[in-house]
């Protein structure tokens, strides 16, 4: 579970430290308030390629840091050990990325890692789904089962 997200010099965000509690978290706000910046930061911390154009105007680097509390670190530890890193001693993992105009660096528990390894770890930390895809699936599923046998023409279309 993500417990802390820190963002510095990313797009319109000068500095943000967001401690997340347990339970459902909803991010809402006006257009341009920074919701997409937060989602983008989370994607980058999980291994997505960084766009240098997102570095805050007038700055050379942006930094994103996250803390995840793990219920079971065995799967993450296996990936870390496979990548030549020490296993997590406790059930917490700290990921940090520094995106610069000349170079990007990423760290897991203060050890430098490749983007490939970061992505492998990131895939195990977060399950993401998009509202639009989920809605499309639900709509398609309901339409298929509700209207499939109503008419001969629609039955052929399914």
Residue ranges of each PLM-predicted region?
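Gly/Lys-enriched N-terminal cap/neck module of very large, oligomeric protein machines
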Residues: 3-142, 152-158
């Amino acid at each position: 579970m993500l417990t802390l997200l820190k963002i510095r010099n990313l797009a319109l965000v000068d500095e943000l430290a967001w401690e997340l509690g347990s339970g459902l978290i909803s991010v809402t706000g006006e257009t341009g308030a920074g919701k997409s910046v937060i989602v983008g930061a989370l994607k980058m911390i999980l291994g997505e390629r960084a766009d240098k154009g997102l570095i805050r105007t007038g700055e050379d680097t942006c930094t994103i840091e996250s803390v995840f509390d793990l219920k079971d670190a065995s799967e993450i530890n296996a990936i870390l050990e496979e990548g030549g890193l020490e296993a997590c001693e406790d059930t917490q993992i700290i990921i940090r990325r520094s995106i610069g105009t000349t170079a990007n660096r990423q760290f897991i528990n203060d050890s430098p890692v490749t983007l490939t390894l970061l992505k492998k770890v990131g895939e195990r930390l977060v399950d993401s789904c998009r509202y639009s895809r989920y809605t499309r699936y639900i709509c398609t599923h309901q339409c298929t089962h509700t209207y499939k046998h109503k008419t001969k023409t629609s039955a052929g279309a399914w």
